[in-house]
């Protein structure tokens, strides 16, 4: 206990000795094997106000409903395949099972329609087993849905939809029935996986841990992983990790990147982006073609015929922007200021950045998403 207190005190002293840009280890890395697991299930939502599946078009909904009734000893008469169930909808149920979740605990679930239900508002999910990728049942879901959207339709065909009424959530809607085995307490080492691979950050993590616990305790496996010696006793291992995850490490600077989303026009320029000496001018040419036909009317008693003579008018207009120059080592602020001065739109800025990259003047990775 005394050694643990001394270790905590040393941790606090080392944490305060670093700059304000340091980040906690838990914010930049995770423990290998300690993660959430995805669960999925298929079930029925009942109690809808006439907004359920049109079962004549979604036969799987009616089949699921009949199978459920048969489990309660209710036999559906033959030839009932055309029954319309307006208050029932087939849904997919999915959730993330947190690490170390134990039987009896609850997790939030999301419920989404997989048929043609218009809205799940006001519905209740019936008991639905939720399986993992191995096919085993890890949780049972059931409960009333919370739907943020709604759908309304008038008799004249007018319709209004707010948000997405065909999907909802049930807070604490699934009860955990089985734990996922974890290798957390196995072996005498643990592996820390960086959220973003960086050799500088990995080295700084190793240096910080070894400075606190002694040489050789931490070892970098590569730019994204650090192996740490850990106690074998589970209780001591938890105390040990509670200290490690609160260590503050100054992460390495990210590589210079420019991210472009061509669909939305969003452009993100990283802090370390620089431009080599270059001169840029950007203009746009607009060509407008209009049809203005002329009607030719012959004189009276001339024997001629009225004719339509086609006539096209072509107008070309080019917007000229002044040329601006980038000097050596131009930074992000100067790039943004220069582009704003010429009034370039996001689409124009994309073209400018792509041209600078092709010219070898943009000292950054250009990534289009």
Curated annotation (Swiss-Prot):
- InterPro entries from the UniProt entry: Flag_FlgI (IPR001782)
| Assembly information from the UniProt record | The basal body constitutes a major portion of the flagellar organelle and consists of four rings (L,P,S, and M) mounted on a central rod.
Signal peptide positions (record): 1-22
Q: Which GO terms describe its molecular function?
A: structural molecule activity
Family, per entry: Belongs to the FlgI family.
Q: What protein name is recorded for this chain?
A: Flagellar P-ring protein
An example GO biological process term is:
bacterial-type flagellum-dependent cell motility
Q: Which GO terms describe its cellular component?
A: bacterial-type flagellum basal body, distal rod, P ring; outer membrane-bounded periplasmic space
- Keyword terms, alphabetized: Bacterial flagellum, Periplasm, Signal
Q: Name one Pfam family in it.
A: FlgI
Asked if the record carries the keyword Transmembrane helix, the reply is no
Lineage, broadest ranks: Bacteria, Pseudomonadati, Pseudomonadota, Gammaproteobacteria, Pseudomonadales
Function description: Assembles around the rod to form the L-ring and probably protects the motor/basal body from shearing forces during rotation.
Protein's cellular compartments: Periplasm; Bacterial flagellum basal body
């Amino acid at each position: 206990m005394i050694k643990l207190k001394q270790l905590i005190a040393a941790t606090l002293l080392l944490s305060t000795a670093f700059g304000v840009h340091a980040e906690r280890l838990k914010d930049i890395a995770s423990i290998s094997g300690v993660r959430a697991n995805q669960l999925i299930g298929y079930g029925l939502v009942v109690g809808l106000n006439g907004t359920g599946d049109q079962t004549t078009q979604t036969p799987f909904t009616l089949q699921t409903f009949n199978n459920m009734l048969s489990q309660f000893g209710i036999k559906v008469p033959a030839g009932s395949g055309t029954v319309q169930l307006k208050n029932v909808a087939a849904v997919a149920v999915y959730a993330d099972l947190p690490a170390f979740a134990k039987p009896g605990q609850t997790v939030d679930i999301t419920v989404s329609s997989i048929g043609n239900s218009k809205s799940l508002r006001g519905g209740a999910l019936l008991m639905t087993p939720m399986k993992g990728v191995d096919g085993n049942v890890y949780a049972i879901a059931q409960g009333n849905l919370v739907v943020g959207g709604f759908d309304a339709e008038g008799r004249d065909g007018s319709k209004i939809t707010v948000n997405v009424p065909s999907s909802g959530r049930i807070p604490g809607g699934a009860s955990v029935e089985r734990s996922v085995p974890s290798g957390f307490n196995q072996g005498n080492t643990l592996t820390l996986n960086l959220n973003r691979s960086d050799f500088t950050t990995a080295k700084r993590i190793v240096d910080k841990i070894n400075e606190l616990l002694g040489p050789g305790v931490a070892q970098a496996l590569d730019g994204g992983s650090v192996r740490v010696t850990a106690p074998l006793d589970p209780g001591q291992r938890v105390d040990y990790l509670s200290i490690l995850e609160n260590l503050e490490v100054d992460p390495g600077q990210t590589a210079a990147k420019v991210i472009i989303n061509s669909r939305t026009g969003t452009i993100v320029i990283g802090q370390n982006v620089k431009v080599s000496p270059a001169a840029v001018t950007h203009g746009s040419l607009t060509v407008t073609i209009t049809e203005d036909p002329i009607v030719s009317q012959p004189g009276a008693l001339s024997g001629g015929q009225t004719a339509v003579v086609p006539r096209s008018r072509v107008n070309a207009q080019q917007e000229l922007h002044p040329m601006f120059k980038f000097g050596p080592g131009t930074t992000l602020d100067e790039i943004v200021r220069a582009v704003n001065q010429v009034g370039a739109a996001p689409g124009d800025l994309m073209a400018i950045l792509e041209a600078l990259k092709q010219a070898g003047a943009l000292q950054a990775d250009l990534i289009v998403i």
